[in-house]
Amino acid sequence: TGEGSDEILAGYDIFREAMIRQFWAKQPGSSLRPMLLKRIYPDIPHLRNASPNILKMFFGYRLEDTGNPLYSHLLRWNNSNHIKKHFSDSIKASVNGYDPLEDLSGKLPSGFYNWSTLAKAQWLETTVFMSGYLLSSQGDRMGMANSIEGRYPFLDYRVIEFCSSLPDRLKLNGTDEKYLLKKLMAGRIPDSIVKRPKQPYRAPISSVFLAKDKPDYVNEMLSESMIRKAGVFSAESVASLLEKIQKSVTASEMENMVLTSVISTHLLYHQFIDDQNQDLLNS
């Protein structure tokens, strides 16, 4: 499978986004530079006809903080940080004063501050996301559950070391991601594949979980009794969110993010922590 190729050859949109934001930051008042962001997110409907002001609202967070070692991911992590607004009072109190970005900054490798913006972004994506989440939840765990052994040629340490030695322009050339790989594959696979725009796999969220024919478990996972029993989220805040989504035609990216977090957290709670498993936990 292709795990690792996006990380080591700069295939993810977040890499292009970081470079465009850095370019934009050199002239933050420009109305043209932010328009480049529309090229990399054609799949997000509300950005297709967005004005420079709308783009600044979505992508302008800490735009000029280019010296920050976590610059590439600051916007994404700020968006996901909105989930904390829906935490219960007890959870808010338990995380009060903890800054995960400060914690991560203290664990960066030697010389990290001198790396290029792209190299920093690749390290963060590989270390935080791929190693800590992607390979287990979407790779090995899914494969092993179905008696399939995944093979990951792009994760061969020799391939990783080679790609790490490449100049940035051979990985991300302008907004052309996986540049060297595409050049090498030209003539070996059809041009329609080589030149095909990158298409993220996006699952529907609110349109499924809040539909009339939604899965049976959803009502239970979003119920006030489950929210109060698990104690992670605020029942009032979640109820307000659900009401807002149901009144809207479509949910925002952040609303979908919160909805997914609530349902996923409660499924984990039900599976591993609920009272019916208390005997196992105590054994």
Where are these regions (language model features)?
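Active-site adenylate/phosphate-handling loop in enzymes that bind or generate adenylated species
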Residues: 1-48, 116, 135-159
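Adenosyl-5′-phosphate
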Residues: 49-283
